[in-house]
Amino acid sequence: MSLIVDASVAVKWVADEENSSRARALYLADDCMAPDLIIAEVGNAMWKKQRRNLVTAEQMKAAMLALPERLHLFDIAELAQRAAEIAIKLDHPIYDCFYLALAERERCALVSADAKLLAAAKKVKGIEARKL
């Protein structure tokens, strides 16, 4: 099954957090897709964890290598116009709206651990949102 995952899910693939085991099960079982923005978002989250000594520098670098290998990535330039439309309509940060635009376009469920993103997804017709 193809799913759109956001950074809140992908970080759990590479760092031990609440529901990491559920996120890793998705990683192993499903075809996961995301806008390429996810690399920067996960990188920033891992950098913050590395600064707080929650992960090592090696773990951070390994995460950056693993993401493009495991995820089917989509260029955000292709999603930008629709993401902007959604952001304006919902008054929601455009970062999240790239995931919504991709879920809408690909007709795939969006999986997230982010309550605000899931709430926004419910406001876009045709998007199935699933809490991790």
Question: What are these language model-derived features?
Answer:
Residues C97:
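N-terminal active-site wall of soluble small-molecule enzyme domains
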Residues D36-L37, Q59-K89, A101:
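Acidic catalytic patch
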Residues N44-R51, E104-R105:
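Short glycine/serine- and small hydrophobic-enriched flexible loop segments
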